[in-house]
Amino acid sequence: PTRFETPPPASVDMLWANMALHESADPQALLAEWHQALKVDGFLMFSCLGPDTARELRDIYAQLGWPPAGHELTDMHDWGDMLVQTGFAEPVMDMERITLTYETPARLLHELAELGRNFHPARFPALRGRQWKARLEQALVEHLTGQDGRLSLTFEVIYGHALKAPPKIRISALSAVSVADMRSMLQGQRPHA
């Protein structure tokens, strides 16, 4: 995936990340970068793949005794928790399962290759040969072919959005708030810095 330069702190009003978060080696750190880049009241929107993605392919790999077909993907509830831990407010999470169909195993495998790579630590350590690919294609036809003759594969897409909340006022045993700040708070304005 293309890596963009990190914008200066508090310089972005809205950040939209489509299908990037699940490929991050450290998603919590990436969320922290996004939080830092957003202005107060900035809006984050993202989509990523969820754990039910390609579940049929994972089942086939397991039946054949092969290592996992892909790395573990994060559940939407865990993404919501990470948003809160990073300092985002009012996270809203949703998901949908989309079934894509393919005419041939070759087309299915080509599209999967375009989507990314397998980060699972137990993945195949080296290239596989033609016999392996033929066996995989045969298993795809046997297990994924529907009544219409097409191969079906499920993708779970997670959607999330959240706001960067104003910094919380630190409260200690002794706190001082000016009269001007109290008036501003009562009128729905931000306190003076």
Residue ranges of predicted features:
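Structured loop/turn residues at beta-strand edges in well-structured enzyme cores
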Residues: 10, 86, 153
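Catalytic cores of nucleotide-enabled group-transfer and carboxylate-activating enzymes in metabolic
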Residues: 9, 34-37, 67
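Conserved catalytic/acceptor-binding region of the Class I
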Residues: 45-107, 114-128
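A short acidic, Gly/Pro-enriched loop at the edge of an enzyme's catalytic core
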Residues: 4-15
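A short His-aromatic
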Residues: 7, 22-24
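A short beta-strand submotif of the Rossmann-like class I SAM-dependent methyltransferase core
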Residues: 17-20
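A short glycine-rich, Lys/Arg-flanked "PGG" loop and its adjoining helix->strand segment in the class I
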Residues: 28-43
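Conserved Class I S-adenosyl-L-methionine
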Residues: 96-193
